[in-house]
Amino acid sequence: MEEAGGPMARAKARVVSATLTWRQRPPTQEEIKHGFHKVSLVSGAQMEAPQKEMFEFSRREEVEVNGFATQEEETVNCQGPRDTAGSKNFQSHGPIFSKKYIPPPKEKRPEGRLKEAVDQSDGSRQAPRTEPPCVGAMARTELLVPLPGPREPSPHPGVGLTSGSSRSLEEYRVTRTVRTTTVVGGHVDRRMSSSVTVRPVSSGEALPRGRQVSRMVPPVVVGSPPGSPSRSQAVKVLSNLVPAGHSPPASHLPRPTAGGPRSTGLGSTVGAALRQLPETGTAELKDSSALASTGIPASAHLPKNQDAPAACPDRDQGRAPDARACELWQVLGAPSSTELPLQTSQGQASVPSSPRLETHVPSPGLTHPAKQPVVPTHPGARLTPLVLPPKKKDGPVDPPAATVLPMVRSEHVTVPGQPPAPSTTRRKDVPSPGGLSAPSSPRNKFVQNSENVPVLPFTQREVVKGPGAPAASSPTRKEVVQGSSASAASSPTWKEVVKGPGAPAASSPTQKEVVQGSSAPAALFPTWKEVVKGPGAPDASFPTWKEVVKGPGAPAASSPTQKEVVQGSGAPAALSTTPKEVVKGPGAPAASSPTQKEVVKGPCAPAASSPTQKEVVQGSGAPAALSPKSTEVVQGPKGSSSIQKEAVQGIAGSLAPPLTKEETVQGPIAPATSLPKQDKGVQDSEGSPISSLTQKEVVQDPDALPAPSSSVDRVSPSPGGTPAPVPTGAEASTESQLVSDPTEGKTCTETSREEDEVALAADLEIFLDTLRSMEPPEILRTHRLPRAPRSSYLSMYATLPAIEEDQLGPWVLGPGPQEVPSLEEKEEEEEEEPENPYLSDDEKLQRRQEKAGPSPSRDLHPARPTQVSCSPLEMMKKHVAGTKGPHSELGLELQGGSRPTSRLGGSLLFGSLVPTAKEASTPEPLGTKLSALLPHGAPGLRKVPGQLPLLCSERSSPTEKLACSLPLEGWSPALKTQGKLNTRPGKVIFFSESGCQGSGREVWGDIVDASGWAPVASIRVVRGCWVLYEEPEFRGQKLVLPEGDMELRTPGTKWSPQGIGSLRRVVWDYSTPEISLFSEEGLKGEQVKLTEALKNSQGLEKPLQVASATVSAGLWLLYPKPLFEDTPYILEPGEYPTSEAWGTSDPSVGSLKPMRLGCPSVEKPGEPRAVVYEAPGFQGRSWEVSRDIYNLQQPEDSQSPHLASVGSLRVLGGCWVGYEKEGFRGHQYLLEEGEYPDWSHWGGYDELLTSLRVIRTDFGDPAVVLFEAMDFEGHGVEVSKALPDVELVQHGPSTQAIHVLSGVWVAYQEVGFSGEQYVLEKGVYRNCEDWGAGNSTLASLQPVLQVGEHDLHFVSKIQLFSRPDFLGDHFSFEDDQAALPASFRPQSCRVHGGSWILFDETNFEGDQHILSEGEFPTLTAMGCLASTVLGSLQKVSLHFSEPSIFLYGLECFEGKEIELSREVRSLQAEGFNNHVLSVRIKGGIWVLCEHSDFRGRQWLVGSCEITNWLTYSGTQRVGSLYPIKQRRVYFRLWNAALGGFLAVPDHVEDMKAGRVVVADPQAGGSCIWYYEDGLLKNQMAPTMSLQVIGPPSPGSKVVLWAESRLPRQTWSISESGHICSQMFEGQILDVKGGRGYDRDHVVLWEPDEDRASQIWTIHVL
C-alpha cells in the first residue's frame, strides 16, 4: 500500500492538515488538486467467498495542533482472507475530524465504570493524556476508549448469519513513535515514546476505533476506485492510530453487558468535525462466539468511530454561505444486500447541493458532471451535504458499543449487577438494564436508527432524498441518527444523540436530545431534552420540556409537562425545536417540537395518553412528525431529510426545486389520512404518520397520497409525484386522539415482539398512571419564563419574516397555531374582555348575546391568497433590504424583547384587534389624574387617591396626551373661522397693602375717574385684561394689568404715579388678536400682519421696521428689545399713523405680543348666589336665587316672584349655567361671577334665559378624554389644559363621546373658544345629545379653574342662615363657637372645607349633629328636629391616620370583636350583632350612630378607647358608623429640637429617590407635605411617598420613593407629635444626628423620651 501525506501548512485556526487516503493507484489530478484533509474509510460489502491476501501498511504522520506537535510512525501487517475481486461495492466514508477538546477536571469526570480495562495492543492499562488546567494550555486531549465486548445481533429481519470471512489468520504489527511538543505558558515540553506490538486477531474482536485529530480545513470526499483494500483492513489500520500510551484508566472505561440485545450499526456513518470533540479510543470484542450466537458474523462488525468531517475555516460565523464557502459532501455507505436487502436501492446518484441553493434535478440514474466530486454509483449509495459548522460546536459520534463521552456535568449511570460509585453534585442515577448508559458530551446528540437510517441535521439547509436515504435535519441543532448497525453524523449546532437498538442511552445534563432505537435503554435528562427510543427500550422519566420518540417495543416514557412521545418500529425520530423541520418516511425518523405534547406510536407501542395539548399519530414504519411552529415535514419512501434550504431528491436520487416555508414531502407507499379537527394523525401504509401544522407545502414522490397541510395552498411535486391538496386551517386539539395502526407488527421481528409487548404493557401502565397524576400544563403556563431565542448563523439576514397568521409569542407554551377555535374559547375564559361600564343593563345583555351568537367576522377559514414561493434565504435578504434601525431583528429576536408580542399581529382574522404602533404604547401616569384610555377596550374602574373610582380604559398613548395637547407654537385660530364670540365679565380687586392684603375695593367695570381713591399697594385681576391710566378720562401713562396679582410699590414695577386716574377693561372676549404693521407712515408700504406673539424680530429675513400700525383686535405690547424685554408700548384697538402715536420715534421693534383672556374661573364655588333682574341694566323686579331654577317664569313656590323675562343678572358667588329653555335645555351659557348688563354680555343668541343651574363639583385637577366614536370607541385623547383646537392633539373633527375625569370643562363648537358652548361636569357623555349638541362637531375646550386653588391654604368654614333654603340673615364662622347669639336661630347652613359638630346646648354639650362638607337647606337635612335650637358649634380637628375601629361584645375589650375600616350603613345588614359594650379606635375619626342608615343620636369619637360604651353613650348598641373623610391639607413638619422643617432638598420629579432631611426654611427645597391614604407625600413630588430603605432597624434611612412600591409603607401622626410607621410597629421618625455628613438625614428609630428630635409639630397652611 502506498501512503500519501497531506501538506503540513498551518491554517488560520492554527490547524495543520493531514491526509490519509487509501488507494492502489497513483492519485488522479482530480484528487491531488484538492488540499485533502481527511481520513477516508473504504469498505465493501462481502458478497462472495473470500480469498487470502497479505496486506502491509506503513504510515508516518506529523501533526501540530494548537501547540501540540505529534509524530507517529506505524506499520501494520495483516494477513487474512480477502473477498473475491469484483464482488465489492466500495463506499467512501466521510472524513473523520474533531475539534479541540478541553477535558473536564478529573474530579468531574464520569464515575461508576467497571474496574478493569484491556488495552487494545498490549493489554496494559493506559492513562488518558491530559494537560493540567492552566492559562497557557493550548490544547487538551483525552482518549476515551470503550472496552471490547461481544456484539449483539440486529433485530431486523434482513440480517442473518452470513459467515464467510474470518480474521483468524490476520496479524497486527504496529510500530508507534509519538513525539509530542507542548507549549504551555512559554514552556516547551518535548516527549517521545515508541512501541511495537505484534499480535494475532481473533475472529470475535471488534475493529479498533480510529483516532481523531483536530483539524479545521475544507474536506473533499473522493470516491475510492475499484480494487481498493477491504473496509475491514482500512478500519484495522485506522484503529491502530491510537497511541499505545493514551488509553484511559480502567475506571473510565465501560464494560458492556451481554444481557440486552444490541444491534451493530448497519451501513456507514458520518460525523461532523467540530471543536471540542473527544478523541475516542477503540475497543475490541474478545469473544466472537457471542456474536455468532446472535446471528451476526464477526466480519459484520464495523468500526466504532467513523466520522465524516464537516469543517469550514471561516471565522465569520455570522455570514451566509458565499462562493468561498466550503462545500461539504457526505457519502453514506449502504449496507450489503446480505445484511439488509430491504434498504438497498439501485442506481442512486449523488447530487451536490451548493450553499447557494443551487438545485440540480437529474433524472433517475443520472451521474454528476466530471468537475464535481464523484462517488461511484452502487446499491444504497447515499449523498448528504454538510454545512458550515458554527464555532464552538461539538459533534462526537457514538459507536454501536458503549462509548464514554466527556461531560461538563457528570451524571452517575448505574449498571445492573454493579454497585453505583459515589457521584458528585448534579449527578443522576440512570438504571439501564438493556445496556450500559454512557454519558454524552454537553449539547451533543447521537441518533442511532434501528433500520440503518442515518439522519443528518444541518444548519439552514435541506436535502430531501429518495428511497433508502432518510435524514432528518434541524436548523439549529446537531442531530446524529444511527441505525441499528450504522453510526450517526452530527451537524454543526445543537447536537443530538440518538442511539439505535443495542446502544446504551447517553445521559446528557443540559440541552441534549437522545433518540434511541430498539432495545436501547432510556436515559434520564433533567432539562430541555428530547429522547427518541427504539423497540425494547425501557421508559425514561423526563422532568420538564422533553420529547420522547419511541420505537417498536419501547414502553412509553412519562413526562410531566410539554412532552412529545413519538413511537415507531422502523426508526426513531430526531427532534428539533423551533424553527423545526421534520423529515419522515416509512422507516424514517420523525421530528417533533418541544412545545406541545405529542404522542406518536408505532406498531409495538401501546398508545400513551397525554393530559392536554397532545397530538397523537400512529404508524408502523415511522413515527409522526409533529412540529407546532415553523415545521417542515418531508416524507420519502424510506426516509428523507429537511432543512430550511430544501432540495427534494426523488426515487433514484433526483432533486426537486427548493421549497420555501414549510414543506411536506411524502414518498411512495405513504398514504396520509386527513386530520380530524383539533387532532392530527396521518398514517401511511407502512404506518408513517405525518403532521404539518402551518404554512406547509407538500411535495410527494410517486404513489404518495395527499398529505394534510394548512395555510399555504401550494404543491411542488417531484418527478412522478402527484400533487397533494393542502387544506387550510387544520387545527390541533387539546385532547389526544389515537389513530389505529392497521399494519402493526410489520417491521417488528417475530423473536423480539413477544418480549417487547410484555415489557411495553408494564411500562405503559406506569406511563399512563404518571400522566393521570400530572397537572395540566395550563396551570404551569403562567409560571414559565420566555424562552431565549436561539442564535443562527443567518443572523446577518435577521430572521425569517413573521408568520402572518396566528404566530405564538416565544413564551407561549400553549396549543399550536392551528388551534384557532380552542384558543378563542380559552382566551374568552382566561382573558375575559372587561365589560363596558358605560352601557346600561339592557345594552350589556345585548352585547353578550351578540358575542355569544354567530358572526361573519368570526369566520375561521377565510379565503387566503396564494403567496409567492421563494427560498428562506431570499426572503431574509428581501426582509433585510426593507428593514431599518432596531426593527431589523424580527421574529424571535423581536419577540424576546421587553414588549409583549401578540400572535394576532399579522392575522387576517384578528389583526384588527391589535392596536397600531402609536396606540400600543403604555399609558403614562398623570399624577392624581387617570391615564388616557387605550383603544379596543371598555373603560374600567380605576382608583384615584382621595377620589371616587373613575371610569377609564387604556386607549391613549403618551404622544396623544397632554404632552401633545398643548397648542403648537405658531398656531393661530385665525387660520380657521371663528364662530360666535364668547365674552367674559371683568373683576379687579385693589388692596391697600402689599401681598393682596388689607382693605380691598372690587371693580366690575370701567372707572372714568379714580383720582379720589385711597392709595393702592397691590392689585388682583380676577377676570379680563385691564389698563390703568395715570390721569382720569383714560389719559396719561398706562399700565397693563393681566390676570393675576401685581404689586405696585415694588422696585420692578414701571408704575411711577402715586395714584390711579382711571381704569378700563380692554380685553373681554376670545376674539383672535390681530395687528398690521407698516413700513411707512400713514399705513403705507410693506405690510406685516400678525396674530401671534413674535419673540425676536431679528429672526426674520430682514429687520422689522414699523412706522405705522393698525390694531384690529386685542391689546398688543411692542417691546424695543427681543424676548419681551424693556418697557413695552401699549397699543389698544385703533389706528396709529406714526410711531409717535404710541410714544416712540424708533421704528425698530424687537418683539411684540398680544394680551389674551385666560380660562373661566370661580372664586366662591361653595357659596352660590345670583340676582336676576327682569329688565336690562339691572332694572325692574329682581329675584335672588341660590339653587337651581327649573323655570324662572314659573317658580316652584308661591314666595318667589314671577319674572316675565330675564334682562340682566349679577352672579355674586359660585359658577352657574344659564339655559335658553326651561328644564335646562337649549343654548347653554357659562355664567361666572360678575355682572351681565344684558344678554349680549353672557354671549346669548337672543334675550331668552329661562332656567339656571348651579355647578356643585370639585374644580381642581381638570382632565377630560375625547372619543371619536360613540360609546367610547375609536381614537381617544386626554386633555388637561385649554385647547384652542382639538386638531392640535390629532383629534377630530368628530367627537361623539366624552369622559370627564375631573373638574368642569366648557367645550366649544368652533376653534378659539367660539361658537356654541357646552358645559361638561364630571361624568360620562355617550353621545353628542348628552351634552346638548345637535352634531358631533367640537373644535375647542377649556377648563373652569378655581381662584386661589394653588395657594394650598386650608379653610374650614360654616355659614348659618336664619331661614331655610339659605335665605335671611346669615353668619359665617371659621372657629369654634361656644355660644351662638341668643336671637339667632339657624334654619339652614353650608359647610365648606371640613366637618363641624352642632350641639343642642352651649359649651359643646347636649346632642351632637355632625355635618360634613355640603349644603343643608333645612334643620331636618342637618339631622335635627324641627324644634331643635342650636347652642354651640365646634370644628372637627384634623387627623392623619387611616381609619380603624374595633367593636367588642363585652366591657374592657372582651367578648366578640368586630374590626372595621370603612363605613357600615347597618351592622345587622352586614351580618353582625349591633350589641356593643366597648370600643377601641386605632385610627381616624369616627361617627357612631344609634340606628341604621346613620339615624338617631350620633357620637363623634377620635383615637381613644372606651371601656364601657353603655356608660359613655347611654345605649348598648351601634346601628351604623362611618369615618370622617378629610380633604387634602397641606402642612409643614417643624422639628423644634433641631430648629428646622422636614424638607426634600433635591428636585426629585425626575429622580427615583429623594433625600429627606431637616433643613432651615431659607435653605431651599420643598418643605410642604400632605397626607393621602396613609402616605406622607411632598408637594413637589406627588407620585412619591415617604419610605424606609433597607431593613427596619434603628438608623435606617427614610427617603422619598415611588408610591407604587409594594408593600405600601403607611404612616400616622399621633397627637403627641410622633410620626409612626404603620408597617414597622414600634418605629418612629427621627433625625440621625452626630457629626457626619448625613447628620441631618431622617431615619427610623425606636421611641425614646430622651430624644427630643422625635417630636414634630404640624403647621397647617
Curated annotation (Swiss-Prot):
Domain Beta/gamma crystallin 'Greek key': 986-1023, 1024-1067, 1073-1113, 1114-1156, 1168-1213, 1214-1256, 1262-1302, 1303-1345, 1356-1393, 1394-1437, 1443-1483, 1484-1525
Annotated ranges, domain Ricin B-type lectin: 1569-1659
CDD domains membership: beta-trefoil_Ricin_CRYBG2
Start-end of Polar residues biased regions: 337-353, 507-519, 628-644, 685-697, 731-750
SUPFAM superfamilies found in the cross-reference section: gamma-Crystallin-like, Ricin B-like lectins
Stretches with biased composition (Acidic residues): 825-835
Basic and acidic residues bias (residue ranges): 105-118, 841-851
GO terms, molecular function: carbohydrate binding
Stated name of the protein: Beta/gamma crystallin domain-containing protein 2
Organism: Homo sapiens
